Amino acid sequence: MAHCTEYMNAPKKLPADVAEELATTAQKLVQAGKGILAADESTQTIKKRFDNIKLENTIENRASYRDLLFGTKGLGKFISGAILFEETLFQKNEAGVPMVNLLHNENIIPGIKVDKGLVNIPCTDEEKSTQGLDGLAERCKEYYKAGARFAKWRTVLVIDTAKGKPTDLSIHETAWGLARYASICQQNRLVPIVEPEILADGPHSIEVCAVVTQKVLSCVFKALQENGVLLEGALLKPNMVTAGYECTAKTTTQDVGFLTVRTLRRTVPPALPGVVFLSGGQSEEEASVNLNSINALGPHPWALTFSYGRALQASVLNTWQGKKENVAKAREVLLQRAEANSLATYGKYKGGAGGENAGASLYEKKYVY
């Protein structure tokens, strides 16, 4: 009698040792009280950050900034993993110490951004597809050798109810691309972080965002199953359910918490170890408070934590200003924000970390990472 997997013509299973390694890494990334530092800004994106503090975008300055982040003593108490840009994975600081080693010193797992950016989907109104599947398997092998143990692939969708966005074509393209990426990563021992980001652009209500997010996540997990992705060895990086940035209707952090949790419960299998939210242009304080509201509704079948870039780094950059004499203070600010988000993963954040500057909006229209 044929086995069920043979009858169903199911995708080939991962070797047991690979599956075990992936599941172990995924669990470590979402261990209690910790989240992920997204420091994988492209060279073009980091230029925008440096322009804001009037700092030249040189390889030396980029290395100095990464050294500031990864050399922060005690960061590993709140941060489990760090997503790196390819340059950073192979980079050393001024003292000749590899950035990966700085992370290892804090028991932080190195990860790598593997997508190659966005292009327009033909026959759509500028909806986006993510590039990077060609040659991904070979790159994953090199990244693993260099010390990376997980990867990230970002897709974006836009809500525009008047134009019927996101279209079914866009959602399918997003889901299938994420699933192919995830499968390739797992075949090469990297835990895939699956990131279907629905941008906050536009005037749509929080209820519309909930409906669209539910549809997108449903399609993503269907595609993951069809591609044989081991859910126990993967993580999801979604947007929180929020109103569009131009929406005039008032919403509360409790609204964000309730609708985000409801959406996840309707779509995300409990086999997945965890969900690591993106901040999506929320202020540092909003990102912490909303994460707190989400976790206050627990217990949940998955860990619900953070994978923040701007919401962990904005005040750090403003404090640093590219000056060596500001490094120690900037590291204090990083620890303060990381601890705030750690508390939020327990639903115990009371607010107020970072003062007034933490409340500044970090929203960028049509955000490119």
Curated annotation (Swiss-Prot):
GO molecular function list: actin binding; fructose-bisphosphate aldolase activity
Segments traversing the membrane: none
Effect listed in the UniProt record for changing residue 310 to S: Severe reduction in the binding to TRAP
SUPFAM superfamilies listed in its UniProt record: Aldolase (SSF51569)
Reported impact of residue 154 to G: Abolishes binding to TRAP
Gene3D superfamilies the record matches: Aldolase class I (3.20.20.70)
Binding site for D-glyceraldehyde 3-phosphate: 42, 45, 113, 195
Key words of the record: Actin-binding, Cytoplasm, Glycolysis, Host cell membrane, Host membrane, Lyase, Membrane, Schiff base
GO terms classed as biological process: glycolytic process
Keyword Metal-binding: no
Pathway(s): Carbohydrate degradation; glycolysis; D-glyceraldehyde 3-phosphate and glycerone phosphate from D-glucose: step 4/4
Regulation of this protein's activity per its record: The cytoplasmic tail of TRAP and probably other adhesins acts as a competitive inhibitor as the binding sites of the glycolytic substrate fructose 1,6-bisphosphate and TRAP partially overlap.
Effect seen on changing residue 313 to S: Severe reduction in the binding to TRAP
EC number: 4.1.2.13
PANTHER family reported for this sequence: FRUCTOSE-BISPHOSPHATE ALDOLASE
Family: Belongs to the class I fructose-bisphosphate aldolase family.
Subunit structure as annotated in this protein's UniProt entry: Homotetramer. Interacts with TRAP (via cytoplasmic domain); the interaction prevents substrate binding and thereby inhibits aldolase activity. Interacts with MTRAP (via cytoplasmic domain); MTRAP phosphorylation may increase the binding to FBPA. Interact with RH1 (via cytoplasmic domain). Interacts with RH2b (via cytoplasmic domain). Interacts with RH4 (via cytoplasmic domain). Interacts with AMA1 (via cytoplasmic domain); the interaction is weak, however it may be increased upon AMA1 phosphorylation. Interacts with EBA140 (via cytoplasmic domain); the interaction is weak.
Function: Plays a key role in glycolysis by catalyzing the cleavage of fructose 1,6-bisphosphate into dihydroxyacetone phosphate and glyceraldehyde 3-phosphate.
Protein name per its UniProtKB record: Fructose-bisphosphate aldolase
Organism (species): Plasmodium falciparum
